Amino acid sequence: MTARELDAYFRSFLNFGPFVSCDVALNGLQVANSGAPVHKVAFAVDACAQSIDAAARAGARMLFVHHGLFWGRIEPLTGMQYRRVQALLTHDIALYAVHLPLDAHPQYGNNAGLAARVGLRQGGPFGFIRGTAVGLWGTVAENTTPSQEAMQQHAACTAPDTHRVTHANAISPSAGLSLQQVVHRLFPAEEQPVRLLPFGKQRIERVGILSGKAGTYLAEAIALDLDLFITGEIEHSCYHTAREHSISVIAGGHYQTETVGLQLVARKLQRDTGIETLFLDIPTGM
């Protein structure tokens, strides 16, 4: 497939439309290649010198990222930006970026992937940006394991509306998880959250998830009477706000919470097209 054909493929399911007015990122093909067929696609969180160099060493002809190079304004190709674009052109690598549509996708998105990890039963949309929901909230319980919920999400491929209306009140009020149980489910590969604010209930049921930098959405979590807010990165002011409203917060890391959707899309691409994929893990610790 060419880069243009891959652009059409990604657009066929990632649903850019709702985010045209609320996403400052340029979603889609940001830098083309020469038109040569793409037999390998590298996936990374950030378009940066490290990811471009790693993609080149791996022989990839496309780099698919969550954080691209262009963010809603005209940027001169000088300095760092010039070097990045020059490296892409030198190695004939197309750059493809998907920001909010990748966070929000109900099956292949960052938030859906995190929800599957913790075994979330979805209650409704959460994290509205100019009227468009990017995150989700729901409930967790000991009798809903991550693997069971992941299977439900897989089955939802042909019935996404059914998945969306699996309501929280289906779970017994006595069920719930401890904060450490949620952390263990969220980071099964021995990763660690950047910050925990353990100010909520001992047994957690109502959970909101919004990947990346979303500390400002703590107020929305409080308004929904959630027990736990899971995000990537928070502001200093979140500490006292969470403490005084008795809500726990997991700041899982901006990077760590945004690796999930990329890997889901990579698996789908390889399954659908046979194109080889690889994930470039370049953690920032943030």
From Swiss-Prot:
One CC-aspect GO term: cytoplasm
Tell me one GO molecular function of this protein: metal ion binding
Q: What does the entry list as the binding residues for a divalent metal cation 1?
A: 66, 103, 258
List the InterPro entries hit by this protein, alphabetically. Answer: DUF34/NIF3, DUF34/NIF3_sf
Q: Which family does it belong to?
A: Belongs to the GTP cyclohydrolase I type 2/NIF3 family.
Oligomer and partners = Homohexamer.
Q: What is this protein's name?
A: GTP cyclohydrolase 1 type 2 homolog
Q: Which organism is it from?
A: Treponema pallidum (strain Nichols)
